């Protein structure tokens, strides 16, 4: 089989407060995060949003220690996975590729080439597939493969999602059981699954399978848990006025409070590592919402991090991927079924000189409009909630 590598894909996060603005710029520069009908606005808009949002984001990161722990946790996961694979007889080198901050995916591929890896398993640390997470990372890898002919020598296999993996479900159920054991009457605790949201249009118009996979994952976790508790699934991290997947976490918490629910256990279902959405958004912001709603006991299940059952489940995914037929990048980023990722041809400036000139003029007009809005504090971007 030759030298085998595993590439773990994740979002990335700012290590220090000074990293927050460039991290946000990278995030909002991704057309799978903000879909614009005119792509020449992507970079100016990303610059504007990252500039205006950086101070508030820095305050949030300051509440959790001044930076994201995601890189260190992902490195620990990679080390644990490599060790577990070695224990069961597989010599594998594990790499980390982050989408929006160091170590970037491009850096990981450079190390993979240097180490002369011949077989590569690409494993996103997102249990459920979304255009905006795994899909975006797969798109980057597809472009890297196109631009570097030497990578064609590497046989790769993709794992699009693994929300229904038995080991993953068992690890989640184990964490939930441990936390329920701290309540005096665990069977009456309301279990609250909070998933990262996406715009409703991603599901309705682009065919993103994320909502379906989240809902099925929730059902499977409860089946594996095998307890009588009532439960709710809601979606967090909404940005702007457009409709996202519902119910929203803050609204669902308020509704539970109105129903007289006093004890809830929050499950961060789409996160396998602690980061800003768990440590700050859930632990601080949503805790305040719950307390104001009259919920007396608000507790959260920790992220999986390096839970032994979870790491073993990742190892089994890798082993299975080495022997099974795999998807290609194109099958994921350009599927025949009704799923539409952002068309890359929209990034082309035009086929003629005249087209390029007019696009350039329009880009300049758009950029000037953004600057005017930045100075005045009024305009369409403020109206829709992006600024």
Curated annotation (Swiss-Prot):
The keyword Signal does not apply. GO terms for biological process: heme biosynthetic process. Its EC number is 4.98.1.1. InterPro entries: Ferrochelatase, Ferrochelatase_AS, Ferrochelatase_C, Ferrochelatase_N. It comes from the Bacteria. Transmembrane segments: none annotated. Its main location: cytoplasm. It is found in: Cytoplasm. Pathway: Porphyrin-containing compound metabolism; protoheme biosynthesis; protoheme from protoporphyrin-IX: step 1/1. Fe cation binds at residues 196, 277. GO terms for molecular function: ferrochelatase activity; metal ion binding. It catalyses: heme b + 2 H(+) = protoporphyrin IX + Fe(2+). Keywords: Cytoplasm, Heme biosynthesis, Iron, Lyase, Metal-binding, Porphyrin biosynthesis. One of its GO terms (cellular component) is cytoplasm. Catalyzes the ferrous insertion into protoporphyrin IX. PANTHER family: FERROCHELATASE, FERROCHELATASE, MITOCHONDRIAL. Belongs to the ferrochelatase family. This is Ferrochelatase.
